[in-house]
């Protein structure tokens, strides 16, 4: 299992005060159109999030987990995936769903309790949202192991918040992935 880690206290800055890429910083080779598309997706999901929080606070919608501040991480990581890769979201990954082709209408239906909101179209390769903390981690690991055993060349990304790291499912899923060298990417968002 490969690990990429940086010191969480280390400041990460890509652009200088004038908006130019800082010297010595590696940035992905993206076209201007790709960057604009990603920015528009981040803005759209932020606006959706603001509206959904408003609906929830008005009592017009039940539980809703805001994602404010995570738009960039979600949109960028989803763009790094290939079409055949799989996503195992926690309950905040509305931006990932949008990039993968899941409509925001379907996301809203899910959080409003409508049964159509829980149906995931086959072409988006997203498993249903896992609300209990960390329960999607063993599922992602198991699916990636099955794919590996079948000789497939797919990646499986599993999103979770920092609270999941205190759960048994987190440790079991990562241990299994390490032992069997599964093609699983574990994406931990710091929700603090």
What do these predicted ranges mean?
Residues 183-184:
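Short, proline-centered helix/strand-breaking motifs
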Residues 26, 33, 126-127:
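Short coil/turn segments at secondary-structure junctions
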Residues 12-19, 40-53:
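N-terminal glycine-rich anion-binding loops that anchor highly charged ligand groups
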Residues 6-7, 22, 40, 53, ...:
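Short, functionally important structural connectors and interaction interfaces within domains
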Residues 1-27:
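Charged, compositionally biased N-terminal leader segments and the immediate start
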Residues 47-50, 54, 58-180:
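Cofactor-binding active-site loop characterized by glycine-rich and histidine/acidic residues
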Residues 189-192:
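Thiamine diphosphate
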């Amino acid at each position: 299992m490969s690990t990429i880690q940086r010191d969480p206290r280390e400041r990460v800055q890509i652009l200088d005060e004038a908006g130019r890429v800082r010297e010595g910083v590696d940035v992905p080779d993206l076209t201007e159109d790709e960057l604009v598309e990603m920015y528009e997706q981040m803005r759209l999901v932020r606006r959706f999030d603001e509206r959904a929080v408003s609906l929830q606070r008005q009592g017009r919608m039940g539980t809703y987990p805001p994602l404010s501040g995570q738009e960039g991480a979600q949109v960028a990581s989803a763009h790094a995936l290939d079409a055949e890769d799989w996503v195992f979201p926690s309950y905040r990954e509305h931006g990932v769903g949008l990039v993968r082709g899941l409509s925001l209408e379907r996301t809203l239906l899910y959080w409003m309790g409508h049964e159509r909101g829980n149906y995931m179209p086959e072409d988006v390769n997203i498993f249903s949202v896992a609300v209990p903390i960390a329960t999607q981690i063993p599922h992602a690991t198991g699916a990636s192991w099955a794919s590996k055993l079948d000789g497939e060349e797919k990646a499986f990304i599993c999103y979770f918040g920092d609270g999941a790291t205190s759960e048994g499912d987190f440790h079991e899923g990562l241990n299994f992935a390490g032992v069997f060298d599964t093609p699983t990417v574990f994406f931990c968002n710091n929700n603090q």
